[in-house]
Amino acid sequence: MKIKLKIVVRAVALALFLTACGHDLNTAQGVAEEFVDHHYVKIDLQKAKQFTVSVAQAKIDEEIRLTSGQTIDASTQKPRVNYALLEKNEGEQRSTYLFEGKIQSDDGTSFTRKWSIATRKESNGWRVSNFTESE
């Protein structure tokens, strides 16, 4: 019985460790997922901007401008957002990913959105070059 418990504890510890490690930022998919986490889940535009170039960076800059003066911090009621990867098209220099997000508010309402994330390989690694949202 003690051996089984040790195995379960080790498996749980390993799972928690792997979850805490985050995404592999050396891959296009890892960068796309990190961007989605910061932009849509955590609503941290400054962090999301770190993973962008080109059109994506201009869009984030505009979102920052439009939301200036609106404090989003630990006290802000944020929706619960879960997402899944639906499709991916990966290449050596450019890749695209389609995610579906489920957004749930505290009042029990929910809706889904699809996020298309385009990435490209830059001299400093993979970056999000464009993103769009649809119903």
What are these model-derived regions, one by one?
Residues 10-11, 63:
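Short N-terminal leader segment in a subset of presequences, especially plant chloroplast
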Residues 89-135:
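Exposed beta-sheet edge and beta->alpha loop/turn motif
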Residues 26-44:
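Short, aromatic-enriched amphipathic alpha-helices that serve as compact interaction elements
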Residues 17-20:
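C-terminal motif of bacterial Sec signal peptides marking the signal peptidase cleavage site
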Residues 45-94:
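Short solvent-exposed beta->alpha transition segments
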Residues 1-9:
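Bacterial N-terminal signal peptides that target proteins for export
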